[in-house]
Structure formats: C-alpha cells, structure tokens
From Swiss-Prot:
One of its GO terms (cellular component) is extracellular region. It is found in: Secreted. It comes from Gemmula speciosa (Splendid gem-turris). This is Turripeptide XIV-01. Keywords: Disulfide bond, Neurotoxin, Secreted, Signal, Toxin. Its main location: secreted. The keyword Signal applies. Residues 1-21 form the signal peptide. Contains 2 disulfide bonds.
Length: 56
C-alpha cells in the first residue's frame, strides 16, 4: 500500500512539473517573436533614416 502512495505522489509531481514548464516555453516564444519584430523595425529605420520619404 505504501508503494502505491509513493507512486501516486511521484506521478502527480511529475505531471505538475510538466504543466508548469508549458507557460514558460510559450513566454519564451512570444519574447523571441517580439525581439525579432523589434529587430526588423529597427533595421528598417536605420536603413531609411534621413531619406526624403522619412522627412515627410
């Protein structure tokens, strides 16, 4: 009986740990895409700064 209790607790802890890891991975993906879009817009501004179209 004691073995079954330990096994159940171990399985519950394992499932909780995998649930906690999912939001972290999603947040990292959102952060990476935000950094990527910022890099693209900053690169655009750097290349087009001072051009006649940017002065308007």
């Amino acid at each position: 009986m004691r073995f079954h209790v330990l096994l159940t607790v171990a399985l519950l802890l394992t499932s909780l740990m995998s649930i906690e890891a999912k939001p972290v991975n999603g947040a990292e993906m959102e952060r990476d895409s935000a950094i990527e879009s910022c890099f693209v817009s900053c690169t655009y501004c750097a290349y087009n700064c001072g051009t006649p179209s940017s002065v308007d």
